[in-house]
Swiss-Prot record:
It comes from the Eukaryota. Through the activation of JUN and AP-1-mediated transcription, may regulate apoptosis. It comes from Homo sapiens. SMART domains: ANK (SM00248), FN3 (SM00060). GO terms for cellular component: chromatin; ciliary basal body; ciliary base; cilium; cytoplasm; cytosol; nucleoplasm; nucleus. This is Fibronectin type 3 and ankyrin repeat domains protein 1. Mostly restricted to testis. ANK repeats lie at residues 109-139, 143-172, 176-205, 209-238, 243-273, 277-306. Polyubiquitinated. Polyubiquitination leads to proteasomal degradation. It is found in: Nucleus; Cytoplasm, Cytosol; Cytoplasm, Cytoskeleton, Cilium basal body; Cell projection, Cilium.
Length: 345
């Protein structure tokens, strides 16, 4: 029996283009008998797909094997690619097909595009995405923020209006329970705060720590926002559900901002309110060494004689925590409050 005669390879046809997406291209080839795997592997034809480098005008192998289909992945959207097929015979001879050119498709609109448009304050792109109807307006980003939350936090008032007009829910919350109004109050964006209030945002909403928008506005320290919130009817002495702190208590604990504290007190905040542990704003200000705030609270009627749950007063606390400047202040105030002894002649 004569040995099988291997014919030299003829020039193959270019690979056929199958399914094309924004990041992949399917290529396949049908070479009749050459694709059949008969006999030992050394008698099979081997196929390679090569991709052209448009800058260097060279080719790189992206697939080699015995299959008749390959999906090229990890491609860029709307980009032209050129491929050729290399067929290698069992004897090692090879032939190349003509080139085939194919472009990937446009990347489909997704939630990432929505959040990207908001992040860079691109009004036109945001409108186009929303008008396309393929992306839900309230889909959160990877941090759990809706597009409205991001726009409110950044102070992009025009984007806020676009999102609200397209049906976004102004009362949605992120993973920590904060809504768009809280974020805008903390960041000090008064125009956004006013707009959200007109469209249903509530002062009563609470985050997971039980804090309201006024607690966050106090932390942010933006007096114009706080002043407007008070005029709009926001409760001044609202208590969080965690520590039992009012906004004034948070000022004493966090920033020590005298202007914010003064605004709250003038609007009716109780300077002698107690938290769950019996501490007053004055005690908390002393512990955090906010000397000027301590002075303000005393001037506004804070009672320095109040004791906490352990029977300790503010002067004892200041000494224990070595708040020397506060100790001096409290001692000076105490001296001034002592009644003068009458002179006996």
């Amino acid at each position: 029996m004569e040995p099988q005669k291997i014919m030299p390879p003829s020039k193959p046809h270019p690979p056929v283009v199958g399914k094309v997406t924004h990041h992949s291209i399917e290529l396949y080839w049908d070479l009749e008998k050459k694709a059949k795997r008969q006999g030992p592997q050394e008698q099979w034809f081997r196929f390679s797909i090569e991709e052209e480098d448009p800058k260097m005008h060279t080719y790189g192998i992206i697939y080699t094997g015995y299959a008749t289909k390959h999906v090229v992945e990890g491609l860029e959207p709307r980009t032209l690619y050129r491929f050729r097929l290399k067929v290698t015979s069992p004897s090692g001879e090879c032939e190349y097909s003509p080139l085939v050119s194919v472009s990937t498709t446009r990347e489909p609109i997704s939630s990432e595009h929505l959040h990207r448009a908001v992040s860079v304050n691109d009004e036109d792109l945001l409108v186009r995405i929303l008008q396309g109807g393929r992306v839900k307006v309230d889909v959160p980003n990877k941090f759990g923020f809706t597009a409205l939350m991001v726009a409110a936090q950044k102070g992009y008032t025009r984007l806020v209006k676009i999102l609200v007009s397209n049906g976004t829910d102004v009362n949605l919350k992120n993973g920590s329970g904060k809504d768009s109004l809280m974020l805008a109050c903390y960041a000090g964006h008064l125009d956004v705060v006013k707009y959200l209030r007109r469209h249903g945002a509530s002062w009563q909403a609470r985050d997971l720590g039980g804090c309201t928008a006024l607690h966050w506005a106090a932390d942010g320290g933006h007096c114009s926002v706080i002043e407007w919130m008070i005029k709009d009817g926001c409760e001044v002495d609202v208590v969080d559900t965690g520590s039992g702190w009012t906004p004034l208590m948070r000022v004493s604990a966090v920033s020590g901002n005298q202007r914010v504290a003064s605004l709250l007190i003038d609007a009716g905040a109780n300077v002698n309110v107690k938290d769950r542990n019996g501490k007053t704003p004055l005690m908390v200000a002393v512990l955090n060494n906010h000397e000027e705030l301590v002075q303000l609270l005393l001037d506004k009627g804070a009672d320095a004689s109040v004791k906490n749950e352990f029977g300790k007063g503010v002067l004892e606390m200041a000494r224990v925590f070595d708040r020397q400047s506060v100790v001096s202040l409290l001692e000076e105030r105490k001296k001034k409050q002592r009644p003068k002894k009458s002179c006996v002649c």
